[in-house]
């Protein structure tokens, strides 16, 4: 075969192979592009689903992603609020430091341990610590013998009541008529109502209601420590009150 014709055939075969290679590269590039586009679409889909889930969680539990103070603001919370006599303490290092709390994760029940004392009397004791410097002590609320509720510290400020749980709990001091520490009916009713309202306010359940005893082992509140059945009933009553507040007839 003449050398010129052979060279032409070789050149033609080479051109065909080059075209095939270009076609393969083109197809490969197209496949990669399509795969990349699919991955991008899948990524956006997953991101969208995550954002929707996060939005749902945030609507139902606004503080889920943060460790900052927040309150639930609904008609049910407003309607369930008990009568509260707001008598805030004077800012001072011994009973009202004005330190901000973290996200509220619990309600702590205390008893005053001074039989017959009144709610305002206990509030005034906390107020007096700014002058006596006797100790550091306070409570967000005090429930009195007639069912009155006195607020001493805003719920977004730390009260000196529950040791290492001061920063993530709201404290309730409760008055009692005698040394048994048992609460009378008026005090008990207000305790249940106040605790239920606070649970709704901070998106908590009755399981988040604890005793001072559960934090430190201190016999406080005495009657609820010595009578577990009474404590269990209190939390059940709080649960019932919350259900009524959420679904009023």
Task: Label the model's feature ranges.
Residues 2, 33, 40-48, 55-82, ...:
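Basic/polar, cationic surfaces and motifs that engage anionic cell-wall
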Residues 2-162:
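N-terminal catalytic cores of peptidoglycan-degrading enzymes
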Residues 97, 129, 152-158, 163, ...:
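Surface-exposed loop/turn and secondary-structure junction residues enriched for glycine/proline
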Residues 108, 142, 171-173, 210:
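Soluble periplasmic/extracytoplasmic beta-strand elements of cell-envelope proteins
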Residues 163-171:
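Short coil-to-beta-strand
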């Amino acid at each position: 075969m003449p050398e010129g014709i052979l060279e032409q055939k070789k050149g033609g075969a080479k051109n065909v192979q080059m075209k095939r290679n270009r076609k393969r590269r083109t197809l490969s590039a197209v496949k990669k592009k399509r795969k990349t586009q699919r991955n991008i679409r899948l990524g956006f889909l997953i991101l969208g689903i995550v954002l929707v889930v996060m939005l749902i969680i945030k609507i139902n539990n606004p503080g889920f992603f943060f460790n900052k103070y927040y309150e639930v603001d609904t008609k049910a919370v407003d309607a369930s609020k008990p009568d509260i006599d707001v008598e805030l303490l004077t800012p001072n290092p011994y009973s009202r430091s004005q330190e901000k709390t973290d996200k509220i994760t619990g309600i702590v029940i205390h008893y005053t341990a001074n039989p017959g004392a009144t709610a305002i009397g206990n509030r005034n004791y906390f107020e007096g610590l700014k002058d006596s410097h006797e100790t550091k002590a306070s409570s967000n609320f005090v429930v009195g013998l007639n069912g009155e509720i006195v607020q001493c510290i805003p719920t977004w400020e730390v009260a000196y009541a529950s040791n290492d749980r001061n920063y993530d709990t709201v404290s309730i001091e409760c008055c009692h008529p005698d040394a048994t520490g048992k609460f009378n009916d008026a005090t008990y009713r207000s305790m249940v109502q106040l605790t239920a309202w606070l649970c709704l306010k901070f998106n908590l359940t009755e399981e988040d209601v604890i005793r001072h005893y559960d934090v430190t082992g201190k016999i406080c509140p005495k009657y609820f420590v010595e009578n577990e059945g009474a404590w269990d009933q209190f939390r059940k009553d709080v649960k019932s009150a919350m259900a009524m507040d959420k679904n009023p007839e």
